[in-house]
Amino acid sequence: METWQELKVTVKREGEELVSNLLIELGAQGVAIEDSLDYVGNVDRFGEIFPEVEQQEEIVVTAYYPDTVDVTVVEVDLQARISELTDFMDLGEVKMGTTALAEEDWADNWKKYYEPARITHDLTIVPSWTDYEATAGEKIIKLDPGMAFGTGTHPTTKMSLFALEQVLRGGETVLDVGTGSGVLSIASSLLGAKEIFAYDLDDVAVRVAQENIELNPGMENIHVAAGDLLKGVEIEADVIVANILADILIHLTEDAYRLVKDEGYLIMSGIIKDKWDMVRQSAESAGFFLETHMIQGEWNACVFKKTKDISGVIGG
């Protein structure tokens, strides 16, 4: 019987997606997240701030490797990669531990962490293997969390989904920059966008996004391609959404302003508290006006608008 190895990495919550992605890059066949916080308060109107909730600082990212992989080498490589990123994000004291599993344990273990999750008023994320009956008006996003890039329930993703739900009215062109799992593209299609163009620099992300899109019927209007932010893109959009690190977002804003139509929106998430002012200044310098600022814990998300009428924007 083939055996598997379970590598558990304890890290600050801010590092969930980063560590998950690094583990996949280092050969993990699946990842699972243990998090004490899986909650966002209801938002009744656009622009309302999410409530603070009591939470533990650390989460556990569990990665699964076949026994042919030397996990001690993975641990060394992971620690080295994390050390290179300490200037961008405080991951706290990173702790690691390994356990051997039988094949049937692997098949069951990682799935137990994932259940259907109602993320916004309209959107529910459902693991691909789960039978789920939607209620009236509920829109279902099927994802395979074992493919990497998390489950779509991370605070940065949740706030991105809230923002999309509020700005999309139907018929828009959307650019999804750093698509990852493809969850924001799928949501955009469900919320009525006419065409969605999704880009990611990572070939793994491009493949994963395409596979997740194929789990959801009627997604022929989503086009996935490799791309470095918006370099070389000439498609004008009503909405651009990017859930990536703040230090990367600041290199996006000028191209975003060039491509967003008048009265269009730039949604940005993945911004830790200490980087918020930097991102805001970058967007405003490009010509955008801040319409909405959302906060959950250490995370910030925002909606900027390209407009000449500033009466409805913050400070207008």
Swiss-Prot record:
<dbReference type="InterPro" id="IPR050078">
    <property type="entry name" value="Ribosomal_L11_MeTrfase_PrmA"/>
</dbReference>
<dbReference type="GO" id="GO:0016279">
    <property type="term" value="F:protein-lysine N-methyltransferase activity"/>
</dbReference>
<dbReference type="GO" id="GO:0005737">
    <property type="term" value="C:cytoplasm"/>
</dbReference>
<dbReference type="InterPro" id="IPR029063">
    <property type="entry name" value="SAM-dependent_MTases_sf"/>
</dbReference>
<feature type="binding site">
    <location>
        <position position="178"/>
    </location>
    <ligand>
        <name>S-adenosyl-L-methionine</name>
    </ligand>
</feature>
<keyword id="KW-0489">Methyltransferase</keyword>
<protein>
    <recommendedName>
        <fullName>Ribosomal protein L11 methyltransferase</fullName>
        <ecNumber>2.1.1.-</ecNumber>
    </recommendedName>
</protein>
<feature type="binding site">
    <location>
        <position position="157"/>
    </location>
    <ligand>
        <name>S-adenosyl-L-methionine</name>
    </ligand>
</feature>
<keyword id="KW-0808">Transferase</keyword>
<feature type="binding site">
    <location>
        <position position="243"/>
    </location>
    <ligand>
        <name>S-adenosyl-L-methionine</name>
    </ligand>
</feature>
<keyword id="KW-0963">Cytoplasm</keyword>
<dbReference type="InterPro" id="IPR004498">
    <property type="entry name" value="Ribosomal_PrmA_MeTrfase"/>
</dbReference>
<feature type="binding site">
    <location>
        <position position="200"/>
    </location>
    <ligand>
        <name>S-adenosyl-L-methionine</name>
    </ligand>
</feature>
<comment type="function">
    <text>Methylates ribosomal protein L11.</text>
</comment>
<dbReference type="GO" id="GO:0032259">
    <property type="term" value="P:methylation"/>
</dbReference>
<comment type="similarity">
    <text>Belongs to the methyltransferase superfamily. PrmA family.</text>
</comment>
<keyword id="KW-0949">S-adenosyl-L-methionine</keyword>
<dbReference type="Pfam" id="PF06325">
    <property type="entry name" value="PrmA"/>
</dbReference>
